């Protein structure tokens, strides 16, 4: 929970869940068709989804003095985006622009469980590794190939798995 959503009421009566006039209300999708009355990640009510295309939310995250700006100026080296492949490419590009605005040396890493170089999601080819999005991804296919080899799987299998992600 957070002061922005405030489902549990830990932050008084404000927040999008408790106050229909909250400035954060438009960040979320409230509808009785959803479990709990709002859209949440994979139906987990403790993980309300935000609308990454909402202009005020985008500004809150990427704008001057926003989340990205604040943490990087306080010394963070960069950010890791959880389930980056479920974020819109435009939003990732805006996050990257905010990161690089602070310093070109700051880093944006994405969690993508599959081969990110060939990733299709929601009916389209993902573009986050084409220069305007992520600096890198967590390479789980490579990690799995190496671990399988170390655990005794045939070297040829590891080689084929690694070559499948080398394009």
Residue positions per predicted region:
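Acidic/aromatic-lined carbohydrate-recognition and catalytic surfaces
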Residues: 1-44, 80, 85-119, 137-140
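An active-site-proximal structural segment forming one wall of the substrate-binding cleft
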Residues: 3-4, 9-11, 54-79
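Conserved alpha/beta catalytic core and glycan-binding cleft of carbohydrate-active enzymes
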Residues: 6-14, 67-68, 72, 96-167
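Short N-terminal helix-initiation segments at or just after the protein's N-terminus
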Residues: 18-25, 51-55, 124-129
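Short, functional N-terminal and low-complexity linear motifs
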Residues: 27-33, 58-65, 77, 128-131, ...
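A generic structural signal for ordered alpha-helices
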Residues: 28, 35-39, 49, 70-73, ...
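Alpha-helix-centered segments that form part of catalytic cores
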Residues: 35, 39-55, 160, 164-167
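The substrate-binding groove and active-site-proximal loops of carbohydrate-active enzymes
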Residues: 44-60, 76-86, 146-153
